[in-house]
């Protein structure tokens, strides 16, 4: 059996947690500190990931010197530095403004194309799901059950394309057709 080079999974959530006393590259390298990897190798990998997530030139910046989008990139880098096979993302861009969020969508699509990994992305934003996902699973309101599954057969990039706009409208209409929780009780 081949030896796995990366960790099985990593997470990235809406909580953009950075250690305020660490610079960006040290915050990214934090994900590797629990193992026996030498410090020089941890920093080498962290620097490579800093470049991958578009933070080249900001390696030595402290969190208070970074914008919200840049801190999101640090969090994404920390999730990627261990080379996970599965990346679990729980609304990682929900706190970002629309322009930064769109930029992060493009970055995630680019990174996904470069790395062979599965991404499980949780979002309440239908447009975000259409832009990022190859497969969408829509959940019902309480109790949460799979309501619909959709194979997204649209080429990347999708932002603003007619197919993405049409699928977003279709999925929103499907959500609006679900009876509200109040009507069912």
What residues fall within each predicted segment?
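Helical segment within the ABC ATPase nucleotide-binding domain
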Residues: 101-115
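Conserved ABC ATPase "signature" region
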Residues: 33, 40-58, 110
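Catalytic Walker B motif of ABC-type/P-loop ATPase nucleotide-binding domains
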Residues: 87-90
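Short coil-to-helix segment of the ABC ATPase nucleotide-binding domain corresponding to the Q-loop/switch region
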Residues: 22-30
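Conserved signature/switch motifs of ABC ATPase nucleotide-binding domains
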Residues: 61-64, 82
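Signature (C-motif/LSGGQ) region and adjacent switch/coupling loops
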Residues: 5, 25, 51, 59-62
């Amino acid at each position: 059996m081949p030896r796995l080079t990366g960790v099985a999974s990593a997470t990235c959530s809406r909580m953009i947690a950075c250690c305020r006393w660490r610079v960006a590259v040290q915050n990214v390298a934090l994900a590797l500190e629990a193992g026996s990897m030498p410090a020089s190798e941890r920093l080498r990998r962290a620097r490579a990931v800093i470049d991958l997530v578009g933070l080249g030139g900001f390696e030595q910046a402290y969190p208070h010197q970074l914008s919200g989008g840049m801190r999101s990139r640090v969090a994404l880098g920390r999730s990627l530095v261990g080379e996970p096979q599965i990346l679990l993302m729980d609304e990682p861009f929900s706190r970002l403004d629309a322009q930064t969020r769109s930029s992060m969508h493009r970055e995630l699509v680019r990174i996904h194309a470069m790395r062979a990994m599965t991404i499980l992305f949780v979002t309440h934003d239908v447009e975000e799901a259409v832009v990022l996902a190859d497969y969408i699973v829509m959940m019902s309101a309480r109790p949460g059950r799979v309501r619909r599954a959709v194979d997204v057969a649209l080429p990347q990039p999708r932002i603003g394309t007619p197919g993405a706009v049409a699928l977003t409208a279709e999925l929103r209409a499907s959500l609006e057709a679900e009876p509200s929780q109040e009507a069912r009780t």
